[in-house]
């Protein structure tokens, strides 16, 4: 059975400012760096063999801190990037016009093929994060990878593994530097394929980030 750990990046400046990040970027806060160090301490006891990270700056930095703790190399995979939020990226939630808020709600509330202008749909996000996950099956036997990604991307992945629509990620609370675990199993008696073992564990953190943006 392959165990794969999923980690959301540490708190960023834009998380704290309630600003939409998407595939744009802002640096980790001091709290975000501390959260990543606490993930590293936990990861050291989990037997992690590979770290695979989104290539955006906030995930890169989170992965670097974790890698220092557990002594693993990092592979960067663009398929683990956050949802492309198009023309709304870098905007503060409270500054959106009624029309812009409508675009955002269409996307996150499950409108079929909904997307923000210039961005991508939840189905497109789901397709690429599942492709990244499938690559873990090609790792050597006995591997235990840790994937560093983003709130919407990881929520979409966990939701769809559970058989829910991609936009059901809104119902998952994956806080900054939370740890989830999914397993790949082959069994005649249990569900074969990917199963969710845990989601959104923050027991390793002193104080979880207070942001609710999930991105």
UniProtKB/Swiss-Prot annotation:
Protein's pathway: Carbohydrate degradation; glycolysis; pyruvate from D-glyceraldehyde 3-phosphate: step 3/5
A single GO cellular-component term on record: cytoplasm
Site (Transition state stabilizer): 150
SMART domains: PGAM
Keyword Amino-acid biosynthesis: no
EC number(s) reported in the record: 5.4.2.-
Molecular functions per Gene Ontology: phosphatase activity; phosphoglycerate mutase activity
Reactions accelerated catalytically: (2R)-2-phosphoglycerate = (2R)-3-phosphoglycerate
Family: Belongs to the phosphoglycerate mutase family. GpmB subfamily.
Protein name in the entry: Probable phosphoglycerate mutase GpmB
The organism of origin for this protein: Salmonella typhi
